[in-house]
From Swiss-Prot:
The lineage of its organism: Bacteria, Pseudomonadati, Pseudomonadota, Gammaproteobacteria, Thiotrichales. This is NADH-quinone oxidoreductase subunit C. The gene is nuoC. It is found in: Cell inner membrane. PROSITE patterns: COMPLEX1_30K (PS00542). Keywords: Cell inner membrane, Cell membrane, Membrane, NAD, Quinone, Translocase, Transport, Ubiquinone. It is a peripheral membrane protein. NCBIfam families: NuoC_fam (TIGR01961), PRK06074.1-1 (NF004730). Its EC number is 7.1.1.-. InterPro entries: NADH_DH_suC, NADH_quin_OxRdtase_su_C/D-like, NADH_UbQ_OxRdtase_30kDa_su, NADH_UbQ_OxRdtase_CS.
Amino acid sequence: MSTKLQDHFDKITKILSGFGVEGCISYGEITFSIRDQRDIHLILKKLKKEYLFEQLTDVTAVDYLTYGQSDWQVGKVVSQTGFSRGRQQDFKTAAVDNRFEIIYQLLSMANNVRIRVKCKLKDAQIILVDSVSDLWPSANWAEREVYDMFGIYFNNHPDLRRVLTDYGFVGHPLRKDFPQTGYVEMRYDENLGRVVYEPVEIDDRVNTPRVIRN
């Protein structure tokens, strides 16, 4: 580990000492985890002001709904029975606390350091965090994309609309319980002279399963 990286880590840890934040250095990268999502805006504002993180390079999220679940149960019996291909997807779609994690990538050009700041969203019923578009204008569209793909709402965002999917789109495509086939398909109808939407007729099947070996 470089001494410069450790020095940056120690200084930032001191700045955030009054908050519920845990930090680590792993694979040459600094990561801080915020315990309370209500502190996100205040902490990021403090980092921008006191350690000159003038650039927000990305905002994204992760859905941990199926984390640790295997499509195929791998055991000794597999060698005798083989695998069952084309299995139907079976997601547990009930609200799960800590299901979503929001991630911010920050860059300080003045200090020549990048950090990752992330926070698990505790309440699965109210998926809401404060927007940081007032701190970094680049957050505007990035937060719109996170809302579009994951359904995470950003409080005080100036224009929280979908940015990638079509008008009237139902659902959020990067959620783990969103079917890979989608819900509707579109085609051009020559008789009507316009694009029409129809229910998907493709079976949602797992042909390339995720296997977790312990």
